[in-house]
């Protein structure tokens, strides 16, 4: 952050924040390159870190300084080379550098907000799993929840307008327009699996998405504070970071809402958002939740000009329905405990029913994902991974162990572990079948020759941590412990099966 501060002050003016000149500085691309390497766990490697060099950057900057019109089109074929390199590489480099530049005012504003409020920057708040203790604490006391799909803008200019409050440099905004109009349309842009923009320029995509979500969340927070003096409990997870304090600190200005807000006076409303989905939960009646539903539709359509439909908002009773969030199927179920009480010669059994959050492992979608990448068939029967049969034994085992570890680590919060154990069994047997296929042997013969050492490789981190927390616990207790375990070091959802 100190280096950001130094770079930003070089081009800062009392009237405008001139960010555009930074696009011609070599250290910006060095920062983008270094940060891209640090985030290799989250992003797929598209070759940028392999091909980038100081020489390429110097050629790119010198080309931008020339007077001729510098256009980079993703639609050009791969045969078109620019100074000996693919045009897509230069486009990606510029967009990555531009995203780093535009992040500077956001980062500086967040730091100043934390310093003014003397807020403690907790690393644990960045974890994806940190939202589930919040669910366990709040949701058992609530009755209804709305599962909402966040709509997307119908015009690219809306994305540019969301940045105009912080990025006041017209040249930077025009450059952003160039990137957006060169990369197809927003409909392709929001599907990372098929979009070049989301695949090769993920930092810029994340920045635009975060700013868009932050914009409407700030207005919702502003309206909530205007209609009720009680403080809103707000938390949310972005792709890159959680900004608890920044949301509360900065309301959106210059917005007029003449509509009546009397029906929003609910002190028990809870709000959580992540990856294009948000959840509104309340203790009040379904009438209030339905009013929230139609208000959100009108709010998005009238004030943000985004396409939204009531069918994208589902209202469910927490005690009867589950909601899908962050890969878990969560629901509120009664947990009955029996207490024996004795008064003189009489003994009583008291049944105490308490609501508890249940987080279930999504076994059917996970089997579908494993079947798609050929670890099993559609029925969940393990098969060999034929594309890995040419690798070494250690490489094959390491790949399977890494996938099992990622799945076990993320879904350690499951209330019931049976489905998780089944997925781990599928992957273990798929590993054995892959090794047996490589050595042209049967599974039984291969297991007899290798012995139990192969299964020891799949000793998961969850079991190791449980042994450290409860060293005196019996082996039976360690083996059959099925309580949820939440890790506060998970900053992103890994693509656990995409290891081709």
Swiss-Prot record:
One of its GO terms (biological process) is mRNA processing. Keywords: Chloroplast, mRNA processing, Plastid, RNA-binding, tRNA processing. It is found in: Plastid, Chloroplast. GO terms for molecular function: RNA binding. Its main location: plastid. PANTHER family: MATURASE K. Usually encoded in the trnK tRNA gene intron. Probably assists in splicing its own and other chloroplast group II introns. This is Maturase K. It comes from Fragaria vesca (Woodland strawberry). The lineage of its organism: Eukaryota, Viridiplantae, Streptophyta, Embryophyta, Tracheophyta. The gene is matK.
